[in-house]
């Protein structure tokens, strides 16, 4: 979601850059070097960060040594605070192409194939993004043809009891087979995001219901404007359509 990779990641990246800047400045004072002439590297043997003069690793200090010396010299703590609230909020996008099959005898809707395109800028973790888009489609499909909250029209209170019998959830056998779900990521770059990234969570679910409903319309020629499109709803609509054609 945007609040994660974009807001949280952006804040972390900004803090890391500021702390690095402070580290190099303090290290320069301790090592009698200009901050711009130092570099921050990873000491793989010691498993810790180190500031050194490029080309002269013998003239270096660990991050821990620099931080301790800064405190001992009363130069303050090397730290920085930033807000998760970012100055920008770039939109993310998804597009769904859905193939459905409608059994006109039972009203059951199945999805043989799905193609999803997602735009989250530079994907920080492509596998995680694809997994989120896949999972979000399954949730959206469930919203479209299965899940329904029944409320009291007068009080607004829920009439369901929280049982699987009164709040239908699709099982894995009713979900689209993951092998038939193709997910592609657009190669874009968000200049205000960390390393060009932006969120995807908000858009991952947004167009699923419309795509499935449009595919159902293309299959049986009936528009549905209320969800869920359950088998009972499909059969009633088909019966009404058949009656209208005979009249």
Show which residues each predicted segment covers.
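C-terminal catalytic domains of large/alpha subunits in multi-subunit enzymes
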Residues: 1-247
């Amino acid at each position: 979601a945007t609040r994660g990779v974009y807001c949280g990641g952006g804040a972390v990246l900004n803090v890391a850059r500021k702390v690095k800047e402070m580290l190099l400045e303090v290290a320069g004072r301790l090592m009698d070097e200009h901050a711009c002439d130092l570099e921050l590297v990873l000491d793989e043997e010691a498993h810790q960060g180190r500031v050194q003069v490029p080309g002269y690793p013998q003239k270096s200090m660990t991050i821990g040594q620099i931080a301790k010396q800064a405190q001992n010299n009363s130069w303050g703590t090397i730290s920085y605070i930033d807000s998760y609230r970012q100055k920008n909020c770039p939109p993310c996008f998804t597009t769904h192409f859905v193939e459905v099959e409608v059994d006109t005898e039972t009203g059951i809707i199945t999805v043989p194939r799905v193609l999803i395109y997602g735009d989250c800028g530079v994907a920080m973790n492509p596998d995680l993004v694809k997994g989120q888009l896949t999972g979000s489609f399954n949730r959206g499909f469930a919203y479209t043809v299965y899940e329904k909250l029944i409320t009291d029209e007068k009080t607004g209170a829920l009439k369901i009891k929280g049982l699987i019998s009164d709040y239908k959830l699709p099982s894995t056998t009713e979900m689209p087979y993951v092998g038939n779900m193709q997910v592609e990521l657009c190669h874009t770059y968000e200049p205000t995001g960390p390393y060009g990234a932006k969120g995807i969570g908000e858009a991952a679910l947004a167009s699923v219901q419309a795509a499935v409903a449009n595919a159902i319309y293309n299959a049986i020629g009936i528009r549905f404007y209320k969800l869920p499109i359950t088998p009972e709803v499909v059969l009633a609509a088909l019966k009404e359509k058949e009656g209208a054609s005979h009249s």
